[in-house]
């Protein structure tokens, strides 16, 4: 079964031997030591069985599979195996579960953003479905979309960001990430967005319209230094349209901050991302190119 699931796979093991040889890439063999299983806890072993091991694969075989697949040569593969089997370092979930196989991707996290159009929203949904199905954790930025009640087309008005996030919640939950885990994603909104007050309570199970909740998504608020100064000085805070910057609502910065902290205390979220500090720390060549960080990821 293992041969069928791995590309160019050859497994040579004797049941009576503790030292075995696993070959994933042609010419790259890894010597395994099953006595190192004792370094794993019982909980760790059960987790590996449930989510990571391939059919007929043992714990050390998993480490060897990953080491062989991602190595440059036999010596490199053996070193990687030795480090993993001794627990000196451990790859991420997609690498352990998908490395050396034709399933999923070796990447944990993906970031994207929705544009302020129906086409852009549909593109984001479609992309997130495929990413979740391949085992990726997703972070999506929704700050480009106009808030509820803003003009759309000739005479229409938008229903806001939250209904589209709710659809993303349902789509992500519906997609199974192989046999490892369900789809998982986070969505981000800036502190100046017109819907930030409702967005803060996105995961709160009580109060408000249940059709405007997304209980399975994680969510984060992108906070600026200007907002924190407004909180410090007890000033007004302006919620603005992402489309043209027009002020949609004026609130007290401290009231919004207290609401945010209260929700975090009661529900554990939303995440707080202090975006100006993040962008101060990005590499200079990215700054010179005019690049900026807008959001963070799922974890």
Language-model segments: which ranges?
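Extended catalytic cores of very large enzyme megasubunits
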Residues: 1-299
């Amino acid at each position: 079964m293992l041969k069928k699931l791995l590309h160019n796979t050859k497994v040579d093991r004797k049941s009576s031997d503790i030292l075995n040889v696993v070959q994933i890439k042609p010419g790259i063999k890894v010597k395994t030591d099953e006595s190192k299983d004792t370094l794993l806890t019982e909980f760790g072993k059960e987790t590996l069985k449930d989510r990571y091991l391939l059919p007929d694969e043992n714990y050390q075989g998993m480490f060897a599979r990953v080491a062989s697949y991602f190595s440059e040569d036999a010596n490199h593969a053996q070193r990687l195996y030795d480090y993993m089997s001794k627990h000196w370092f451990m790859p991420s979930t997609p690498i352990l579960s998908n490395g050396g196989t034709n399933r999923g991707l070796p990447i944990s996290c993906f970031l994207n953003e929705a544009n302020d159009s129906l086409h852009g929203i549909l593109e984001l949904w479609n992309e997130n479905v495929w990413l979740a199905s391949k085992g990726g954790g997703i972070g999506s930025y929704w700050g480009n979309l106009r808030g509820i009640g803003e003009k759309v087309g000739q005479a229409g008005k938008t229903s806001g960001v939250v209904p589209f996030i709710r659809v993303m919640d349902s789509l992500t939950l519906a997609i199974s990430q192989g046999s490892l885990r369900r789809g998982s994603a986070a969505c981000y909104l800036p502190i100046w967005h017109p819907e930030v007050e409702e967005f803060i309570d996105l995961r709160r199970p009580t109060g408000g319209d249940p059709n405007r909740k997304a209980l399975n998504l994680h969510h984060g608020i992108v906070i600026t230094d200007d907002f924190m100064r407004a909180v410090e000085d007890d000033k007004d805070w302006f919620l603005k349209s992402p489309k043209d910057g027009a002020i949609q609502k004026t609130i007290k910065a401290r009231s919004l901050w207290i609401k945010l902290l209260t929700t975090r205390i009661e529900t554990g979220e939303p995440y707080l991302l202090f975006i100006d500090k993040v962008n101060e720390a990005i590499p200079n060549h990215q700054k010179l190119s005019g690049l900026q960080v807008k959001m963070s990821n799922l974890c």
